[in-house]
């Protein structure tokens, strides 16, 4: 199973990959079905958003354990420096905006005009492993789809499959996108408290301070 291309450069071909969210008994809760025809058509015309208003790639149907389609994931570009991920789930469209913010990477989740959650990731990779923190407002989204989107996002954007080099990589990352304004710096502090926000920021700092012993 080969990786997707990096959607940070949302032009080009992508390939098959099946992802799954399972329970403790390894039974599938949700899994993806790659929309080959739709993805091929979208990738065939660079900058198709100029004509259609939106270019959607890396489209995957989300199926439940009974093989019923219950949602979709995809990456969408609507203009120069206007990109987002989209979750279709239970009749809702959840827009997911990525921002590189120095030592951390955040994805802000919106239901319409309202921010409902945030994914936070230190820009540190140890032994090809990434770590994510998820904060969602109560009753704003089903936990299984939030967890499954994180798997999809990680594979799409931070895939390390096939890499055998172990160690630690750190970097500072800044993104320049017209949707950067969707990032609300005080979202966690305002909705989960000052102490939780400080815990998250300390987690980011500790990730950079920790050094792998040689």
Give the positions of each predicted feature.
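Intrinsically disordered, low-complexity proline/glycine-rich segments
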Residues: 1-214
């Amino acid at each position: 199973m080969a990786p997707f291309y990096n959607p940070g450069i949302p032009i080009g071909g992508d390939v098959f990959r099946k992802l799954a969210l399972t329970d403790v008994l390894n039974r599938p809760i949700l899994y993806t079905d790659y929309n080959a025809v739709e993805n091929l058509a979208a990738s065939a015309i660079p900058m198709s958003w100029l004509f259609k208003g939106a270019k959607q790639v890396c489209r995957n149907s989300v199926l439940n354990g009974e093989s019923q389609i219950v949602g979709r994931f995809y990456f969408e570009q609507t203009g120069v420096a206007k990109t987002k991920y989209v979750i279709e789930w239970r009749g809702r469209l959840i827009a997911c905006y990525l921002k590189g913010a120095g030592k951390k990477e955040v994805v802000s989740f919106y239901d319409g005009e309202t921010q409902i959650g945030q994914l936070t990731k230190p820009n540190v990779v140890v032994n090809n492993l990434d770590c994510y923190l998820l904060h969602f407002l109560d009753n704003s989204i089903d936990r299984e789809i939030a967890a499954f989107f994180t798997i999809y996002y990680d594979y799409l954007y931070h895939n390390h499959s096939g890499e055998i080099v172990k160690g630690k990589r750190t970097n500072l990352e800044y993104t320049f996108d017209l949707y950067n304004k969707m990032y609300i710096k005080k979202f966690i502090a305002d909705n989960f408290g000052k102490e939780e926000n400080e815990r998250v920021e300390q987690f980011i700092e500790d990730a950079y301070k920790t050094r792998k012993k040689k």
